[in-house]
């Protein structure tokens, strides 16, 4: 089976959830819904990852456990707040990992570590058992080294959860690109402040 890690704001039954704040630490009795689904699908959860405390930060340096380095050069930031989740995938420690994305916390570290970061449509993956940052927009994000792997994880992780008030039954659809690509050019190309 595939190996994976989760950001430390997600519950794993019997393992402390700290959100990178030792004073907050508590031990959940059940795993987050998405974690449960992935384990049931045969993936092996191997650990939790460091993060910007309470998912507040986009650089990966705001943790009492220390900063998470960039996977290519430790002189640079990894991006955050799902910094550890991006790092363990980029360095090949796991096949995929889970993070969260409210305002870039999944996409930023994915980009800075040159991996795939998938932020699904809100409600596609349950956030039950995930410590909220801004519950109306929080999403569980997926980190992988390839798009096919991220899609494989998404297929196992998604699904309606009646115990998550933001969960939605969404049917995934694809559409072929049109035969002719069209794009727009604004009539007014000079914007306020451009002449400064």
Language-model-derived ranges and their functions:
Residues 36, 83, 91-92, 96, ...:
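Residues on a specific face of well-ordered alpha-helices
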Residues 60, 102-128:
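Glycine/threonine-rich beta-strand-loop-alpha-helix active-site module
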Residues 4, 8, 116, 140-144:
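Short glycine- and hydrophobic/aromatic-rich loop-to-beta-strand nucleating segment
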Residues 1-102, 183, 193:
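Gly/Ser-rich catalytic/binding loops embedded in alpha/beta enzyme cores
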Residues 16, 58, 110, 129, ...:
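Short, flexible helix/strand-to-coil boundary loops that buttress conserved ligand/catalytic motifs
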